[in-house]
Amino acid sequence: MKELEEYAKINNIPIMQKDGILYLINYIKENNIKNILEIGSAIGYSSIMMASINSDIRITTIERDKDRYDLAVFNIKKYNLDKQINIIYGDAVDTDITGMYDLIFIDAAKGKNIFFFEKYKNNLVKGGTIITDNLSFHGLVEDSDLVKTKNQRGIVNKIKDFISFLDNNEEFATEYIPVGDKIAISKRRSGYE
């Protein structure tokens, strides 16, 4: 995995931070998660880490960037995980998924978090979880004085809108975990399943 981590760092490709991925791996183990939908593959790092936990785990992951998709396909085959990981080339905005999943992991365009959450929540099994990464945006969400560009401000505002969406969501209860770039763990409340 060091090789993928170094490649991502050198090529400025966002992958989940080390303590975040370790938390995610432990969560998957503790909750006996077997079927995962990942929105945003990048180079396949998270999928490879999750699939490596157990040979019974099956992952469907979606990536819209062709170069990253091709690299993810290469990496998944390199680690002999192509039987466990199904990678789809396409935009998760337009991709229709029919499977049901124990875990939906959203790690894609931050401005689309609400859309992805709403679109894919019906692919969640009873008792399933939606985990969303990058809710701190490198500390900019908590400290707006650090925001330097209009683009950053737009992303920060969309993340704040998403956090408000989660906080006011009657269907899902959400817990925020300060690991990596901050993650949200959202579980459907009883009575909504």
Model-inferred region functions:
Residues 1-103, 110-131, 135-193:
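A short alpha-helical cap/connector motif
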